[in-house]
C-alpha cells in the first residue's frame, strides 16, 4: 500500500526500465484568492478527479500560499502512464498534445466559475489569453456599434481596454518571497490598476458620448430635438 508521495514516486520509478524515463508531468495551478483554503482544496479535487483520476491518472498535489492570501496555488504531479487492472499501462502520448492541454485549461476555468457562482461570488476566470479576450470584446463592441447600441458598445470597449495589458508574471514561490519578486508584482499590479482606471473612464462616457470602435475617437451624443 502506498502511504506517501515518496512511496508513490519511488514505485513509479521502479516500473520504468529506462533510467532517464520521464515518470511524471508537473504543472502549477493558480487558485482563486476569493476562496478559503478548504474551498480551494474542494475545487482542486473536483477538477483533478474529473480530468485525471477518473481516467486512470494518478495525481499528487500540494497547495501553497503566502500570509496575506495573495498567491494561492497548487503544484500538481501526474503519472505519465494510466493505471490498469494489472498496474501501469503504456504511456499516453495524447496527454502531451496541445489539444489536450487546451481542454484541461478550458475545464479548469469552467470548474472554477461553477464554484465561484455557487458561492455567490461575482468574479469569473477565462482559459483564454488576455489578447484573445480583448479581441472578443472588440468584436462585440463593433457589433453593438453596428446595431446602434452605443452604451453596450462602450461597455465592451471598456472591457477590451482593461484587458489590453501584458499578463502578470508567474513567479516561483522562492522568487515571490524575494525583494525582486515583490517589486515585479508591484509593477504588474500597477499596470493592471491603470488599465482598470482607463476602462472606468470609458464607462463614464455612457449616455453622453459615442466612441468609434475603429478609430477610438469620442463624439458627443447628439440630443434628440423636442
Located regions from the model:
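A general structural signal for short secondary-structure junctions and capping/turn motifs
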Residues: 19-20, 51, 65-69
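A short, contiguous, amphipathic alpha-helix enriched in charged residues
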Residues: 31-63, 100, 104-111
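Homeobox/homeodomain signature
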Residues: 17-19, 49, 85
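Single-stranded nucleic-acid nicking/binding segments centered on His-rich, glycine/basic loops
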Residues: 1, 5, 13-15, 37, ...
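Short hydrophobic/aromatic beta-strand micro-patches
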Residues: 30, 77-79
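Broad gene-expression machinery/nucleic-acid interaction feature
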Residues: 24-26, 56-60, 71-75
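Active-site acidic/histidine clusters and adjacent loop/turn architecture
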Residues: 10-38, 42
Amino acid at each position: 500500500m502506498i502511504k506517501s508521495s515518496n512511496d508513490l514516486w519511488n514505485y513509479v520509478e521502479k516500473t520504468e526500465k529506462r533510467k532517464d524515463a520521464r515518470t511524471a508531468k508537473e504543472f502549477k495551478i493558480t487558485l482563486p484568492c476569493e476562496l478559503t483554503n478548504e474551498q480551494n482544496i474542494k475545487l482542486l479535487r473536483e477538477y483533478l478527479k474529473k480530468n485525471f483520476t477518473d481516467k486512470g491518472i494518478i495525481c499528487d498535489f500540494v497547495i501553497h500560499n503566502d500570509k496575506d492570501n495573495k498567491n494561492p496555488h497548487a503544484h500538481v504531479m501526474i503519472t505519465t502512464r494510466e493505471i490498469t487492472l494489472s498496474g501501469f499501462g503504456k504511456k499516453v502520448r495524447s496527454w502531451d498534445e496541445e489539444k489536450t492541454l487546451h481542454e484541461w485549461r478550458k475545464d479548469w476555468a469552467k470548474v472554477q466559475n461553477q464554484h465561484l457562482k455557487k458561492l455567490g461570488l461575482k468574479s469569473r476566470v477565462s482559459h483564454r489569453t488576455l489578447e484573445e479576450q480583448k479581441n472578443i470584446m472588440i468584436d462585440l463592441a463593433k457589433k453593438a456599434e453596428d446595431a446602434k447600441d452605443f452604451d453596450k458598445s462602450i461597455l465592451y470597449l471598456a472591457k477590451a481596454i482593461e484587458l489590453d495589458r501584458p499578463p502578470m508574471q508567474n513567479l516561483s514561490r522562492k522568487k515571490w518571497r524575494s525583494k525582486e519578486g515583490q517589486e515585479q508584482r508591484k509593477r504588474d499590479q500597477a499596470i493592471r490598476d491603470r488599465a482598470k482606471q482607463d476602462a472606468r473612464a470609458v464607462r463614464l462616457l455612457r449616455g453622453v458620448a459615442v466612441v468609434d470602435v475603429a478609430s477610438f475617437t469620442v463624439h458627443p451624443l447628439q440630443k434628440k430635438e423636442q
